[in-house]
């Protein structure tokens, strides 16, 4: 195995270089960067995009447990359809317009803890494919 191959293999180990996100701005920047490389699911961004605190982790495994505002996070990401059901949303208070115009998004996020959320306004506006319940 070459040194480059070893580095790339390590780079794709979930959590190898990851840290939690602490605010909406750094999470939104990482989403934008990741989806510029892999607009459908955020999987191929592993080892190719600089996703801030997530390092090279795939979007599905990002630690978002400290983020309180996810408003407009996937707004206008029309092709996005990643399984982000494992995200810890227990601290989130704002999900307003989170999937606004994310036309392809249709993943089951019903297990998300939304007890702290006070704003879900237009959360799924123009998210035509979405067909699950959340509580």
Annotated model-derived regions:
Residues 8-135:
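Negatively charged
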Residues 1-7:
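Classical eukaryotic N-terminal signal peptides for Sec-dependent ER targeting/secretion
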